[in-house]
Design a protein with these regions (language model features):
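Active-site beta-strand termini and strand-to-loop segments that position acidic
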Residues: 180-186, 257
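Solvent-exposed beta-strand/loop surfaces of large extracellular or lumenal domains
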Residues: 220-241
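Conserved, mostly hydrophobic/aromatic
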Residues: 48, 72, 85-87, 144, ...
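Structural recognition of the beta-strand scaffold that forms the well-ordered cores
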Residues: 42-44, 74, 80-84, 191
Length: 259
């Protein structure tokens, strides 16, 4: 094996955060505990051993996994695994022969799953049998994974966790939101995810150490592009003034700034 599944650390933590059992601030400890071996870890949210995100045994809604997807795929340079049907919100709630109805997709029976059958559409592989929720989720997965390969700040860049500067924030809930930066040469990605169901207007503190470590200039106004939607917005990057951002429920933003 070239990579080790990050199960006990990142997977378990993201699952608990997505289900509301643990604070998003706990994600910081996951990367800290790796002690430099993060490049050898395989990040995932579903596999043959674990229950599907959309199953009744996990989150019950595939949208709740979107913030976890963004974190897992974008926080380091290591690979991210997507299990078949995950990108369509496969619930894994079939009553399969040996495994039964346990929120997993059986590895012991000859079986096919509904989301993949819909995507195959009788061998046409055009996805026309997928419903609108499936298609929207697939677009998000496709976009995030494409960014992992196209954006050098994700593929090669350095990482800076902003959570320590946002504890007990008056407009930032560290239990429901997580934020960090990725940087490569003159490109900065400001990433914020929201594990809450509601839209939030957050104010994020960027500490002086971030400017020094990432070697980024202070500016009252930057034009940033959300790489998930293509939308442009003006944000400030100053150590003495919080950066204000709105994030939809069960979603996130990957704001790109070029210097």
């Amino acid at each position: 094996f070239d990579y080790l599944d990050d199960k006990v650390g990142l997977y378990d933590t993201l699952r608990n955060v997505a289900c509301g059992y643990e604070s998003a601030a706990s994600i910081t400890h996951c990367w800290q505990s790796l002690n430099g071996i993060e490049k050898k870890m395989l990040n995932f949210l579903e596999n043959h051993d674990e229950q599907r995100i959309a199953s009744d045994f996990f989150a019950g809604d595939p949208r709740k996994g979107i913030p976890a997807l963004i974190v897992s795929a974008c926080m380091n340079t290591n690979p991210m695994m997507i299990y078949f049907g995950q990108e369509f919100g496969e619930p894994g709630m079939d009553s399969e022969g040996f495994s039964g109805r346990d929120g997993r997709t059986t590895i012991f029976d000859y079986w096919s799953i509904d989301s993949i059958r819909r995507w195959r559409n009788g061998g046409k592989f055009d996805g026309k049998m997928l419903n609108e929720d499936h298609k929207r989720l697939y677009e998000i997965y496709q976009r995030v994974l494409t960014l992992c390969n196209e954006e050098l700040a994700i593929a090669k860049g350095v990482f800076f966790d902003l959570m320590y500067a946002n504890q007990n924030g008056w407009r930032f809930n560290e239990h429901k939101q997580y934020t960090f930066m990725r940087k490569y040469k003159n490109e900065l990605l400001f990433i914020i995810v929201n594990f809450d169901s509601q839209l939030v207007d957050v104010a994020i503190n960027v500490p002086s150490h971030a400017f020094d470590f990432l070697q980024i200039p202070q500016m009252e106004s930057y034009q940033a592009v959300d790489l998930l939607t293509g939308a442009k917005e003006e944000i400030s990057l100053l150590p003495y003034k919080a950066t204000e951002v709105s994030v939809r429920g069960y979603n996130g933003k990957i704001l790109k700034i070029a210097f």
